[in-house]
Design a protein with these regions (language model features):
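Short hydrophobic/aromatic-rich motifs at helix boundaries and adjacent loops
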Residues: 16-19, 32-34, 52-55, 64
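The conserved cystathionine-beta-synthase
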Residues: 7-25, 32, 71-89, 96, ...
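Tandem CBS (Bateman) regulatory domains
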Residues: 1-4, 42-71, 75-86, 101, ...
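A glycine-centered beta-loop-beta connector
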Residues: 21-24, 29-44, 85, 93-109
Length: 125
């Protein structure tokens, strides 16, 4: 899990988010207000705005963010977490504790955890 989380607010413009994604090399960010996850925004969302001819500097994230965000509780075990990633076809999951954002876990984080926790098996030659 990564913390602190780089996030954005619902009133941020699409342009500001694009700049933040570019500077952090992230592909998406949680949209947060008072430490509560309100939505999530990704590069794909920004690209769709461009295709629609929207003005990135005046379009707030609240108009195009994904609102139905799947989150994980900070005490979630690895198998339910893996299932949430697969079932929901997401690249990242905000991690919460008592409804407040405390971190974020990505597919990369999950793969690293699996690699680090898998014992090496002897090679049969």
């Amino acid at each position: 899990m990564t913390r602190p989380v780089v996030c954005t607010s619902p009133d941020s413009s699409a342009y500001d988010i694009l700049a933040k994604l570019n500077s952090t090399h992230f592909s998406g960010l949680p949209v947060v207000e008072d430490h509560v996850v309100m939505g999530i925004v990704s590069e794909k969302d920004i690209l769709q705005l461009v295709l629609q001819g929207k003005n990135l500097k005046t379009t707030p994230v609240s108009e195009f963010m994904t609102r139905d965000v799947v989150t994980a509780d900070q005490d979630c075990a690895i198998l339910p977490l893996l299932k949430a990633f697969i079932d929901n076809q997401v690249l990242r999951l905000p991690v919460t504790h008592q409804g407040k954002l405390v971190g974020i876990v990505t597919r990369h984080d999950l793969l690293k955890l699996i690699i680090d926790s898998t014992p090496e098996f002897p090679v049969i030659s």
